[in-house]
Amino acid sequence: ILYKIMNLHSKDNKSNLRTGLYIVSTPIGNMLDISNRAIDVLKNSYLILCEDTRISKKLTLKYNINSKLISYHKFNEKKNIEKICFELKQKKIISLISDAGTPTISDPGKILIKECISQNINIFPIPGPSAVTASVSVSGFSEKYFFYGFFPEKTKEIEKKLSEIKDLDSSIVFFISAKKLNRNINIIKKFFLDRDIVICKEITKFYEEFFRCKVSDLKPFKNLKGEITIVISELNNKKKASNNLNESDKKKIKMLVK
């Protein structure tokens, strides 16, 4: 029985691909970074929901995927939910993709997923590329990480949000533009001065680069362009020691007080 359940998703038989909404991860830069299963699901989809049909068309052309592309982004996702759920209720296979990476991670889709959950519509993840996990994997920092999403916009919001997470003892990941990074270096230093940082530029693309330094040594970049993910390290040992007392320290203090 377990074997049969596991093989409901087998690509050897199209009829075994279950109907529902598929959250399909696509390449973040290098077109080869897509799984055979993802291609199979996209080929068998009645519709493919995507942020920008022009971008997704490059992927579907490369892999001979003929499924219809439908524009689905933050400005129309609420409006289209009823129609999408209607098609899903008709036992259709619909895929959701983003311009790059794993859908719903700082991309549209959460509203649709919540609606599918409320209507008992099947939802399946097709795992794959993610700028978040890719950047953490090469950082050399703690595997425990907090993903913030896109770096805040306004100065007051930046100050407020960073003050809330400055003491987290984990790696901290942001998506950020080159201009915004240069503009906010002093604020990053203010809240994360004792940590290390890696700046990941154009991950998996031709101009892929990684810049590593201490936050205290961070300086504005010249001619920095492209998509950027930054990973800030966990607290260093000195900072941890100043913030937390271990059990032996607590016992010693109690003895001294007595």
For the regions a language model picked out, list residue spans one by one.
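Glycine-rich, flexible N-terminal cofactor/catalytic loop recognition
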Residues: 5-75
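A contiguous loop/helix-start segment that scaffolds small-molecule binding in enzyme catalytic cores
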Residues: 8-10, 18, 92-93, 171-258
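Class I SAM-dependent methyltransferase SAM-binding "motif I" and its flanking Rossmann-like core
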Residues: 111-168
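Glycine/small-residue-rich loop that forms an oxyanion/phosphate-binding "nest" at active or ligand-binding sites
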Residues: 84-130
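Short, acidic/turn-prone active-site loops that include or flank metal/cofactor-
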Residues: 27-29, 53-54, 71-78, 129, ...
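Short active-site oxyanion
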Residues: 42-48, 121-124, 170-172
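Short hydrophobic/aromatic-enriched beta-strand-loop microsegments
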Residues: 66-74, 123, 143-149, 194-201
